[in-house]
Amino acid sequence: VCELMPLTARTMHHSCVVRTHTHLWNTHSPYNLLTGYSGPVINGNHFKPTDHPSVGSVMQLAGLGSAGVPNYVWMPTVPGHSQGRQRAGPYGGFLGQRFDPLFTSYTPTFRESIEGRNAHIDPPVPYAAPQLPALDAQPGLGAARLGRRRDLLAAVDRVRRRLGDTSSDSLGVFQRKALELLTSTRTRDAFDIARESESTRKRYGEHLFGSCLLAARRLVESGTRFVGLTFESQLNGKIGAGQWDPHGNNFRLLKNFLLPTLDQCYSALVEDMAGRGMLDDTLVVLMGEMGRTPKVNKSAGRDHWTQCGFIVYTGAGVRHATVFGRSDKQ
């Protein structure tokens, strides 16, 4: 851990660093990381219904989790959204849509001018909190109204079964589950980070990524078994802002934006979970899709380097305060 991450340095006694993460797929798609299978070789590949299911989806299939909260959540929304893509990886694949994660939504605001900014090399900090899309994005569609829709759906299902029509049973299960989650008090409470103290919210950071990690801790406390977070956001709804892909301006990006943001919210999560005893049975994984080139390019950036990267494992099931592996001259 470098000098630009002093808060994270205080938490490393909870962690294990693996310095030999390697694979063959030079792409931003997290497919191989989340499924364990060979990923797409083209960076723009979107998910397909024939893909292998993600780890979170398999956990749902196994019935792990608690009633009343989503078992699998991805924040701030679908991976790749900042570039207009839906990258393969976190979905249910051939298991079906009902094993997809619950994708949150968000509306970023900025506390500095964004006019003329190149979000890829000089991104502004996005501020937002993850939202439940169906309830927060549609005015007037509150919990009571959704509850009435759920009751109506149940009545229609009963009539259909009496008539022997089972053609849409799987869709009915999916719809009922979605309605139950969206009307669940436990779900809405878990996403309500305003219930946290002001000092806690400021410790995580009021930016998008701090808000997402605070919501993640609340979800895990409520019984959610798998939470994913992609460090990316949108600027003007078109350009990515905040992702870790420094092909240019690498050193200023790390010093002024990427590392301070990560240092604040990641260390807050680890310290908070440790203080609550949650690291005993929760694994926190910090990683990227690949490493970055040892050589600096002409734009003062580092390009993709799948040959070697690192992963930080924190919490349950790992040997704490340990470093594994080392790179070689190649």
Where in the sequence are the language-model features?
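Ligand-binding pockets and gating/stacking loops
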Residues: 1-330
